[in-house]
Amino acid sequence: MNTSMQTYLVTQEDRSAGRSTTEIVEAAIDGGIDIVQLREKETTARRRYEIGQTVRTQTAQAGVTFLVNDRVDLAAAVNADGVHLGDDDLPVTAAREVLGQDAIIGRSVSTPAAAQRAEDIGADYLGVGAVYPTGTKDVTAESAEIGPKTVTAITDAVSIPVIGIGGITPSNTTEVIRAGADGVAVVSAITTADDPAAATRKLQGSVDTASVESQLPSEEPSA
């Protein structure tokens, strides 16, 4: 999969400080976001479809990857680039049959074993978390605050890209990237920011810096 996944926005209009999802997406695109995932679980299917049509146009014009959370049917209806699936959604294999071989299909996981299973059945990337405490996503006891060490264990177990999610901000992005993640996914860090475009640029800068630092050789302890 030849898609940049360093910065990944998950939309949530009810956490966007009174602004529309399309406004947030436009600002994030201006700030250089790599991926936009349409979530909007609090809206009706019709409303989500309408938002999805607009976001598809926005992302297509900007060359930004567009995914839909959970709903394979909606992803197909708005011609999204793919879908992100959780434990209660369609299996990766079923989603692939509907969306085709070129679709990008992500899978949420919180353990190395689940990560390996997802890779084995054809997931293109993994959303790993919640890395830190979060109020924007319902998580099970197993997946609550898994921490950077589990991110490392998962990245060591698979060969597909790993995206950290859950409680991530520019201030802790370095820790997540150093743990082995290829990128970070956020909601509030962008959607609640006074300037979502600037927040996106700040997040990208944090990822870029952390990526460079993670490739530097470790300093040997002094004798």
Curated annotation (Swiss-Prot):
Binds 1 Mg(2+) ion per subunit. Pathway: Cofactor biosynthesis; thiamine diphosphate biosynthesis; thiamine phosphate from 4-amino-2-methyl-5-diphosphomethylpyrimidine and 4-methyl-5-(2-phosphoethyl)-thiazole: step 1/1. Residues 197-223 are annotated as: Disordered. Gene3D superfamilies: Aldolase class I. Its cofactor is Mg(2+). InterPro entries: Aldolase_TIM, ThiamineP_synth_sf, ThiamineP_synth_TenI, TMP_synthase. 4-amino-2-methyl-5-(diphosphooxymethyl)pyrimidine binds at Q37, L38, R39, E40, K41, N69, S108, K137. The keyword Magnesium applies. It is an enzyme of class 2 (transferase). One of its GO terms (biological process) is thiamine diphosphate biosynthetic process. Its EC number is 2.5.1.3. 2-[(2R,5Z)-2-carboxy-4-methylthiazol-5(2H)-ylidene]ethyl phosphate binds at T134, G135, T136, G167, V187, S188. It holds the Pfam family TMP-TENI. Residues 206-217 have a biased composition (Polar residues). HAMAP family: TMP_synthase. Condenses 4-methyl-5-(beta-hydroxyethyl)thiazole monophosphate (THZ-P) and 2-methyl-4-amino-5-hydroxymethyl pyrimidine pyrophosphate (HMP-PP) to form thiamine monophosphate (TMP). GO terms for molecular function: magnesium ion binding; thiamine-phosphate diphosphorylase activity. The keyword Transferase applies. Belongs to the thiamine-phosphate synthase family. The lineage of its organism: Archaea, Methanobacteriati, Methanobacteriota, Stenosarchaea group, Halobacteria. It catalyses: 2-[(2R,5Z)-2-carboxy-4-methylthiazol-5(2H)-ylidene]ethyl phosphate + 4-amino-2-methyl-5-(diphosphooxymethyl)pyrimidine + 2 H(+) = thiamine phosphate + CO2 + diphosphate; 2-(2-carboxy-4-methylthiazol-5-yl)ethyl phosphate + 4-amino-2-methyl-5-(diphosphooxymethyl)pyrimidine + 2 H(+) = thiamine phosphate + CO2 + diphosphate; 4-methyl-5-(2-phosphooxyethyl)-thiazole + 4-amino-2-methyl-5-(diphosphooxymethyl)pyrimidine + H(+) = thiamine phosphate + diphosphate. Keywords: Magnesium, Metal-binding, Thiamine biosynthesis, Transferase. Mg(2+) binds at D70, D89. GO terms for cellular component: cytoplasm. This is Thiamine-phosphate synthase.
